[in-house]
A protein has these predicted regions:
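Transmembrane helices of ABC transporter permease
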Residues: 24, 28-38, 52, 66-69, ...
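Loop segments that connect adjacent transmembrane helices in multi-pass transporters
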Residues: 101, 110, 116-125, 194-242, ...
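Cytosolic ends of transmembrane helices, especially the final helix of ABC transmembrane type-1 domains
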Residues: 221, 245, 293-322
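Membrane-integrated ABC transporters
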Residues: 1-44, 58-70, 84, 88, ...
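Hydrophobic alpha-helical segments in the permease module
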Residues: 70-81, 174-182, 247-261, 280-302
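Helix-to-loop junction immediately C-terminal to a conserved catalytic motif
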Residues: 406
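ABC ATPase nucleotide-binding domain helical subdomain, centered on the C-loop/LSGGQ "ABC signature"
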Residues: 101, 336, 355, 415-417, ...
Length: 602
């Protein structure tokens, strides 16, 4: 949204977005508004009933009838108010739930690139805080604006019936109050948006600092990080104070203007009573209407403030809903044929065990338009069985290659094939169901040991889980835990090396066809590394294992080693072949102090 857009252009999409959240629950809103209208009608009728009682008293007539009606109306209004507020409360909770469900679903459908553009703390704030503001705007405030408007109109009509001249004087004052509020509203809306954006920025900064708390403390950077976060906190406070001040100005103008209008009406009405143009009971009823007019006008101003906050929240939620998502719609015929190809590929392994499971055909990829390509004209065939290792200096394109395989990134040119079928003809889920991935910074999924290992394979049996844990030398550790597989994992009961082993176990529990390892042995001891190498060797006999290596000792025995530099594959071969033919590979080996002779002998 450009800064030059008019307020109307900025607000209309937000109005539509607000309605999009209300629409599934519109019948609840309509029912609430009907109840609210009946409640407003009861309130509008009461001053007129009081006038009838006063007239009856002045004329010496019985007041039993009007008093009974007034009492019944008060009880009826109380019941209506209870049902109305209960219904609006349920509607508000439902709106929040549906908004959060929509945003969370979008997060998990979004591309990696669109998620990475924003701090995770800010994304969390949009789900937790912005949806609460949206709730107030789409349920309570939206209904109250209509009800307040109806109450104001109904009250003004009754005031006109009582005394048109006195009404015109009162209405003139209200018009001035409304005009002043309309002038102040846009600035207040801008302040509300800046306030919410600053809260999101603060949340993102704090989340990042807490995530790196060990590094912060080890670097003695507590004070510096505190000050950085306080800069954002002070900025948030500044915008919040600005928004509060603007809201206070609106309230003061509306409330003060209403009081002045009522005082003027009282003075002018007293003059008309003295002139014989208005009865005392009529003036009393008129003043009751005037006082009754103040709450809906003030409520209207407050609701408009809430809706302005809702617009700001809606705008931030709309940004989430516009995040680029991974395409999942694919032509059914193509998908069917692709799946057939997959089945053929699986069955053909016994016939052609070294046929490629994954292929890169002249692939070029970049992270942003106009940037330098991260991969250039890469041709690559990964056999359906065997261990393929990828090495190279930082920035060579190793992680980019994995991102392409996992469809976190799309090729700009060329084609990626899964058993002969182009990626472009396969759904994301179909591709990823064939792969298992262990990333370099291995996260533990919130939950238990069991839920972590069942994360990619919910059908895993307990025996399969224990087999996977045994393979990475974690069986004894988990059995020693108080709750075994049902132990909840936290940063305090799992070390970095154990996190990495859990990630490897999570990947191998379902015996994947293609296992992608991004330096899976970086934080484990030599004994466990040997165990994982055994797992890799075993998996490579029946499937494909692809390893990104920063420690060449983990890939010396690979069937094929790819050497990458500046986005290209500059050499490929076995360890011994590359030691003889490629200077860069020899430099990498020397830099890491790997004894080539010992490795070859092993």
């Amino acid at each position: 949204m450009g800064m030059s857009d008019s307020p109307a252009k900025q607000s209309w999409p937000n109005v539509r977005l607000l309605w999009s959240f209300v629409r599934p629950n519109r019948w609840s809103l309509y029912a609430g508004m009907v109840l609210g209208l009946l409640f407003a009608a009861a309130g509008i009728a009461m001053p007129m009933l009081i006038k009838l009682i006063l007239d009856a008293l002045a004329g010496g007539e019985s007041i039993a009838g009007p008093a009974a009606v007034l009492g019944g109306l008060l009880v009826f209004a109380g019941i209506l108010g209870f049902v109305y507020h209960n219904l609006m409360g349920v509607l508000a909770a439902q709106v929040v739930f549906e908004a959060r469900e929509s945003m969370v679903r979008r997060y998990f459908r979004a591309t990696i690139a669109s998620i990475a553009k924003r701090p995770s703390g800010e994304l969390v704030t949009r789900v937790t805080s912005d949806t609460v503001l949206l709730r107030e705007a789409t349920s309570t405030a939206l209904a109250q604006v209509v009800l307040s408007g109806v109450s104001i109109i109904g009250t003004l009509v009754m005031m006109t019936v009582l005394d048109p001249v006195l009404f015109l004087v009162t209405f003139g004052g209200l018009v001035l109050v409304g005009a002043a509020a309309a002038v102040l509203m846009p600035a207040m809306g801008r302040s509300q948006r800046l306030s919410q954006e600053s809260v999101g920025k603060l949340g993102g900064r704090l989340e990042g600092a807490l995530h790196a708390i060990r590094t912060v403390k080890a670097s003695r950077a507590e004070s510096r990080e505190h000050e950085r976060i306080m800069v954002d906190a002070r900025e948030s406070r500044r915008h919040s104070v600005s928004a509060a001040r603007r809201a206070a100005v609106v309230w003061a103008v509306v409330s003060g203007g209403m009081q002045l209008a009522i005082a003027g009406s009282l003075a002018f009405g007293a003059w008309r009573v003295g002139a014989g143009a208005l009865e005392v009971s009529g003036l009393v009823a008129f003043l009751l209407y005037a006082f009754q007019l103040a709450p809906p006008v003030a409520q209207l101003a407050a609701d408009l403030t809430t809706i302005q906050s809702g617009f700001a929240a809606a705008s931030r939620i709309r940004e989430v809903q516009e995040m680029e998502v991974e395409e999942t719609d694919t032509d059914d015929t193509v998908v069917s044929e692709s799946l057939d190809n997959v089945v053929v590929g699986l069955s053909s392994r016994t016939i052609a065990p070294v046929a490629p499971v994954l292929e890169f055909v002249n692939v070029t990829a970049r992270y942003a338009p106009g940037s330098e390509p991260a991969l250039r004209d890469v041709d690559l065939a990964i056999p359906s069985r065997g261990h393929t290792a990828i090495v190279g200096p930082s920035g060579a394109g190793k992680t980019t290659l994995f991102s392409l395989l996992l469809r976190f990134l799309h090729a700009e040119d060329g084609e990626i094939l899964l058993e002969g079928t182009p990626y472009s003809q396969l759904p994301f889920d179909q591709v990823r169901s064939r792969l298992a991935y262990v990333e370099q910074e291995t996260p533990v999924v919130p939950g238990t040991v069991r839920s972590n290992l069942q994360f990619t394979y919910p059908e895993a049996t307990e025996d399969e889980i224990w087999d996977a844990l045994r393979a990475v030398h974690l069986e004894d550790t988990v059995r020693a835990m108080e709750n075994g597989l049902d132990t909840v994992l936290t940063s305090t009961n799992v070390s970095g090396g154990q996190r990495q082993r859990i990630a490897v176990a999570r990947a191998i529990v379902r015996r994947p066809e293609v296992l992608l390892l991004d330096e899976a042995t970086a934080q484990i001891d030599g004994r466990t590394e040997a165990a994982i190498q055994e797992v890799i060797t075993e998996l490579a006999e029946t499937g494909a294992v692809v390893t990104i290596a920063h420690r060449l000792s983990t890939v010396i025995d690979a069937d094929t080693i790819l050497v990458m530099e500046k986005g290209r594959i500059r050499a490929r071969g076995t360890h011994s072949e590359l030691m003889q033919s490629d200077d860069l590979y020899r430099e990498l080996v020397t830099a890491l102090r790997i004894s080539t002779d010992v490795a070859l002998a092993g």
